[in-house]
Structure formats: structure tokens, C-alpha cells
Design a protein with these regions (language model features):
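Long, low-complexity, charge-biased intrinsically disordered regions
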Residues: 1-398
């Protein structure tokens, strides 16, 4: 956690009191060259806390207030009606999720409690049918950002507040009420979707996409989460990833008009100029757009326990060879798979590790110790270059 606003290296605070650390993260990462606004934003990405249980939350008046606010919002949105359980029906369960959002100076911005359904307790063909929904491809995101850099388009980001709660629910789903908010023998008959339901994402995307298409946008046939509208010289392109919306346009008036329309349909949070989208940190100047995954890299270093390790100068040992027949098998295969998955995500902005990560991904079924050691070397290499990413020049030819 960030101790004070004067600390400009949030992840370095883990080792800040240990003068014996040989390789602190501050030796390879600095925020000093960032603009004041972007530096504050980069630090704010690391300052949030979570509460892990209802038993703790119910003892704190602040969390009680947050939970009551969530219940009131769900009732106002007509998400359910209270009724006796219908014969032959089995209610699903729910749980609370808690998060404290902090400001850059470590003061509390707000306490957020969210009620979610335990979707794993749903029964297929009774509580849900279809669950698939599309999300934008990352190659599309990079392509749009490259176009925006060259064309000088405006980039803005929207977040839909309680997105899933806006969509209608077609199935008959019953849910046990949350603790202390219901009477004995009563259940919640869900009228609208709820976070955690297996069909929640699908229902939300169906409602959002139909709203966008009705405004004259054309949905891409190769990427269903991309929408384009061209009127004369006015261009608006929309990319959707669940409740995160990225918009690029050369027409500010048309862009603002569309945002107002969306806000009238769904309650939006206008995040302003694009800075952070799906783990990608975006910094823009008049000459370029830079993409990196600094926070994701630092979080991975903390998780693996290599934050204070010696950085590697290259991502692989010289003359390294990988084989299924060399080395002892590792017992925690799932952890290896998870680690490689995280590294695959980092290849979005780090092409220098693409070959190695994809090579190591060939051993998912039976990884050996040398494969895990090679993955650790990649992570140590990433410590040396946490801010390195993609540079999209405004002067590139399309």
C-alpha cells in the first residue's frame, strides 16, 4: 500500500525500509520523466484495498452503509421481486465483494460493496441457456490506436456503471437473499441480470450492441465488439470490452452527442482521455502514443516474489534449449500454466519476449524444471524493462 503521496514508487514501498536490498525496483523504474498528471495516474493504479469476508464487513458501519446502498440501488433498478420459492425450484446463492478505492494521497475515495450471484450454483437449461458473448480483439485495439496516432483522432474512454444490472433476464431465476436483508421463507425472483450470473455478460452485450446499432453504427463482421459510423467526414469508431468502452473520433461534437445519448440509456462514467484500457497504460503526445503494461509487470514481480531479484539483461540464457525429455517434472502444473498465461498477456506490448513465451507454452501438459526456470528468467528480464512497450508514431505511414 502507498504510504504517502511523497512516495513516487508504489511497488518499491515493499522494500523501501530495507537498506540491504541490492536490486530495488527503483533501480530499473522511475516515474520522474512522466508528466505530473500521468505520474499521479500511474501511482493511483496501485492504491486500492479489498476486504475478504462478510463477517468482517458487517462489524464496520462504513461497510454496512455501502451494502445498504447497493441493496437500495438494486431495488430502485427493479432487479428483483421478493416472493415465496416456487415449487420444484432451487434458488442460487449470492455473496458480497468489497473494495476500498483510495486516492493518490492514500485517503479513502469510497467504500464499494457489490452483491454478486454465485453463478456456479446455476443449473444449465434451467437457470441459463446461452452464455457466449464477444469481446474486442487486442489486435483491433492496437490497430485503432495506431490509426488515432497518425490521424490525430480524439480518444476517450467510458465505463458503464453497474452495466450488467441494465439487461433483462429471460430465464426464471430465484436467488437466496443476502444475509440480514431478507425474511425467512422468501427468495429474490430476478427480473434483471446480476453480476455473477452465467448469462449476465451475454445479456448486457445484446442490449448495448442493439442500442449502438440503432444509432446508425455498423457492427464489424470480423469483430463483433467493433462498431463504425461514417457520416460525410465525421468518423466514430467504438470498441467494447464488457463494460469498458473505447471511442475514437475526428469529430468532437458528434462524439459528445453520442456520449450524451449513451448516458441517457445507461448511467456512464466518463473517464476522459484514454489512459488505461484492459491493463494497457496509454500515454499520448502530439508525436506519438505509447503503450506499456507497467502495473501488470510489477504486480507479476510481486506475485512471483522476484521484485527485489537481480534483473536479467536478456530474456533467455545463451544456448538454451527446451525439450520434453530434459529435467525433472514439476508437481504444480497449474501454477506453471497460470504463469505462462500471464506472460502471454504481456506479449501484447512486449514483442521481445513473444518467441520465448510461445516456446514455453508448448510444454503446458508436462512442464519440467528447466521450463519454469526459463520463465523466471523472462520475469527477471521484465524487471529491467517494466516501462518498455510499443511506440506508435504519429508520422507512420498506414
Amino acid at each position: 500500500m502507498l504510504a504517502s503521496a511523497s512516495l513516487t514508487q508504489p511497488h518499491d514501498s515493499i522494500a523501501s525500509n530495507d537498506s540491504g536490498i541490492l536490486y530495488p525496483i527503483s533501480s530499473t523504474l522511475s516515474y520522474s520523466k512522466l508528466s505530473t498528471g500521468h505520474r499521479a495516474f500511474a501511482i493511483s493504479l496501485s492504491v486500492s484495498k479489498e476486504l475478504d469476508s462478510y463477517a468482517k464487513a458487517i462489524l464496520d458501519p462504513r461497510w454496512q452503509e455501502a451494502m445498504q446502498a447497493e441493496i437500495d440501488a438494486l431495488k430502485a433498478n427493479n432487479n428483483w421481486t421478493i416472493c415465496p420459492l416456487h415449487p420444484g425450484k432451487v434458488p442460487i446463492r449470492c455473496k458480497w465483494l468489497y473494495k476500498v478505492k483510495l486516492k493518490v494521497d492514500d485517503s479513502v475515495e469510497r467504500y464499494k460493496a457489490r452483491l454478486v450471484a454465485k453463478g456456479f450454483t446455476q443449473t444449465e437449461r434451467i437457470d441459463f441457456y446461452e452464455t457466449f458473448f464477444p469481446v474486442v480483439k487486442f489486435v483491433t485495439v492496437r490497430t485503432l490506436l495506431a490509426l488515432a496516432a497518425v490521424s490525430g483522432w480524439h480518444l476517450t474512454q467510458l465505463d458503464v456503471n453497474n452495466a450488467f444490472l441494465h439487461s433483462d433476464l429471460h430465464e426464471e431465476v430465484f436467488m437466496l437473499p443476502p444475509p440480514r436483508f431478507g425474511n425467512k421463507g422468501e427468495v429474490c425472483r430476478l427480473l434483471k441480470s446480476l453480476y455473477g450470473l452465467k448469462q449476465a455478460s451475454r445479456q448486457w452485450f445484446a442490449k448495448l450492441s442493439s442500442t449502438i446499432v440503432n444509432q446508425g453504427f455498423v457492427q464489424s463482421k470480423s469483430n463483433y465488439s467493433a462498431f463504425t459510423r461514417i457520416k460525410g467526414v465525421s468518423i466514430i469508431i467504438i470498441l467494447v470490452y464488457v463494460d469498458d468502452i473505447l471511442i475514437a473520433s475526428n469529430d468532437v461534437d458528434a462524439l459528445n452527442s453520442f456520449k450524451q445519448l449513451l448516458d441517457s440509456k445507461f448511467k456512464l462514467k466518463d473517464l476522459g482521455t484514454l489512459k488505461y484500457f484492459l491493463g494497457l497504460e496509454v500515454a499520448r503526445t502530439t508525436k506519438s502514443i505509447s503503450l506499456c503494461q507497467r502495473k501488470y509487470t510489477l504486480d507479476l514481480l510481486v506475485e512471483i516474489g522476484l521484485l527485489v531479484s537481480k534483473p536479467a539483461s536478456i530474456p533467455v540464457k545463451q544456448f538454451a534449449k527446451f525439450s520434453n525429455s530434459i529435467g525433472e517434472p514439476i508437481s504444480y502444473i497449474s501454477q506453471y500454466r497460470r504463469l505462462i498465461g500471464k506472460l502471454l498477456y504481456l506479449t501484447l506490448t512486449k514483442p521481445d519476449i513473444c518467441y520465448l513465451v510461445h516456446k514455453l507454452s508448448q510444454f503446458m501438459s508436462s512442464p519440467k524444471v528447466p521450463h519454469l526456470q526459463a520463465a523466471y528468467i523472462i520475469i527477471k528480464y521484465l524487471k529491467k524493462t517494466p516501462r518498455q512497450g510499443l511506440f506508435l508514431s504519429a508520422y507512420s505511414s498506414l
